[in-house]
Amino acid sequence: MNIENVLKKMGLNPDVYVNWSKYLNLWVSWYKGKNASFHNYTIYNGIKDVKKERASLQVAKFICEKMADLLYNEKVKITLGNEESTKILQKVLDDNNFQLKMNRAIEKSFALGTGCIVLDIEDIMVNESVIDYNNSNVKISYVNAENIFPISWDEDGIKELAIVEYNMKSDGTAICILKMYMLNPRLKYTIYNYKFTIDKNNNIVETPETYLKEFETNTNVPWFAIISPNIVNNIDLYSPYGISIFANSIDVLKGIDLVYDSLNNEINLGRKRLFATKEALRFNSTTGEPQLNFDPNDVVFHVLGDSTLLGDNKNSIIQEINGNLRIDEHLKSLNSQLRILGDKTGFGGDYFAFDEKTLSTKTATEVISENSELFRTIKKHEILLESALIRIIKAINSIGELTGQFKLDLSQINIDFDDSIIENKSQERSEDRQDLAQDTLSRIDYISKWRGISKEEAAIKAQEIDNEKSANEGIRFIEGEIN
């Protein structure tokens, strides 16, 4: 299968993707935990080369997973200008399992450097070029960097792009669905849809099932949002692609797996062994064949046959050998590498490090309370993530307006990330109370922020509080007259 041929057939230049694909392949291999050029090796034992596979601690996957959990989890809350809009948006997100999808999208995007959330309309009916949106729904999906092909971009990011989806068939052929998001002369987005069949020999044939080849969105809002780590691409300063969160830490990942593999070998090669002479054997009375007096599946024993034991054990039939394991040295080396990795990836040196006595790691709260590097890293990544989420929300609203199903109030878009482990909320709330008392912060803003609701809802809540306060004062006044 050669997607480059498909793109060339459509008049696009795939060179940007082709030149970048070697880095994607490298990061994918480390994300999976097995880089063939590093983890597969040979060692000469004095007789022949023995093929070996190096053990992997799978740290690259762990980095991306942990950062995704810190950035987007169940505590992230999105509110719009009014309560009704917030409910509509939340339903669209819930229908698409967005919380799980976004968390996984961030993990994969941080692994490969780039990812894309794509929005579409599903379940539409087309009758003689008339589109019926009555039963349509907003569809949110994720496309990884291997299937993203930038068409135009500037310093603010990708403006036009093509994405590819594959459906494999049992006969070895594949259905390739190509979508291109292009700006037309009116600077509105047109989505071009094409479907191809690719056979085993990479022959590409366009299928006739390509209704709505050109779909006008009638908006300048892109129906896609790029997700990338907020890290400058130092491999190619002019590339539209982002780089993996561990792109500049490959050598550290190698060092970690070298130590981890050595630790495993140390334990494996240094295990207890019992060497036994032929006197430890007994012979089958029927066949005369030698048999072991101990469990034949026990790999602790090694029979020497006619050889004799050495040194003080030469008159014995069994000699015990115990290797000296260098566990402490390996753990110290591993810990040093993990500290370097934490610093290189923005987690801080203590995040992945462990106590060499208890082998326990610190919690995120403990790490952040002692080191603000992770705090700054999360806040840095949240800048791009918030921008992507706002684009997704605007795209959802664009689809709602196009289909006539809903219109969101985008006068206010609040994205409240889970900062509970990286900020002193009590201190921040205390400061806001002081501002409130000094009339430098409005009650509505205070209620909106700390209740996690829109300003419209906060205004209603403030009025309820005022009404209740007035009612209570009236009761106290009447009670005073009675007394």
Where are these regions (language model features)?
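Extended, charged amphipathic alpha-helical segments
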Residues: 210-369
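Surface-exposed loop-to-helix/strand elements on domain peripheries
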Residues: 78-83, 88, 283-285, 307-428, ...
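Extended, helix-rich architectural segments
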Residues: 1-159, 483
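Activation/maturation switch segments at domain boundaries
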Residues: 433-483
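Extended, regular secondary-structure scaffolds
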Residues: 111, 116-243
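Short coil/turn segments at secondary-structure boundaries
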Residues: 104-106, 119-122, 268-276, 351-356, ...
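Glycine-centered helix-boundary capping/hinge motifs
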Residues: 97, 346, 451-452
